[in-house]
């Protein structure tokens, strides 16, 4: 019985291909973005379909006040019985950046990073959210001004964004 022994060339090719496969798998797992000092995920701005443009705040000054915060109130679907929706707070910054907060600690380092852009007179917000079931997924909201009320529309929900004036230092800039 004759056995074929691998040649050094075939071993070299096998190691080369296995190395390429391993590096591809590892790089896809670790190149998802970076984290800031507060443990918040920071994505590359190139992953967003909207663009954080310089001077974007000039286009929204009649709609959004950069010195206020906006509290999200879910209008539709109606709240389920004995279920409380998490309320989020939006803070708009200059140059097309928006922070989404789960409480009134408005430190930009603790915010979920988001981008806003004005298109055809409507304000669009985009951010990445995390859930245990889905991992990171993209959320897009269109905001339209109806009289003095801001309404946000996503794929699943309709929101009202209630303006709240707060006192404080608004000089903090986001880290994205």
Place the predicted regions along the sequence by residue:
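Bacterial Sec-dependent N-terminal signal peptides
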Residues: 1-39
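Lipid interaction determinants
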Residues: 29-112, 119, 124-176
């Amino acid at each position: 019985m004759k056995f074929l022994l691998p040649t050094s060339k075939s071993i070299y090719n096998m190691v080369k291909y296995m190395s390429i496969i391993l590096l591809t798998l590892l790089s896809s797992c670790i190149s998802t973005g970076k984290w800031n000092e507060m443990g918040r995920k920071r994505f590359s701005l190139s992953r967003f379909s909207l663009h954080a443009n310089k001077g974007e705040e000039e286009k929204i000054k009649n709609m959004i006040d950069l010195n206020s915060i906006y509290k999200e109130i879910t209008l539709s679907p109606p709240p389920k019985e004995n279920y409380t929706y998490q309320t989020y707070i939006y803070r708009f910054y200059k140059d097309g950046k928006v922070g989404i907060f789960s409480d009134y600690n408005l430190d930009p380092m603790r915010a979920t990073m988001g981008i806003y852009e004005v298109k055809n007179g409507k304000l669009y917000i985009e951010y990445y959210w995390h859930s245990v079931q889905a991992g990171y997924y993209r959320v897009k909201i269109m905001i339209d001004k109806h009289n003095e009320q801001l309404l946000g529309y996503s794929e699943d929900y309709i929101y009202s964004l209630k303006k709240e004036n707060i006192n404080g230092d608004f000089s903090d800039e986001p880290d994205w």
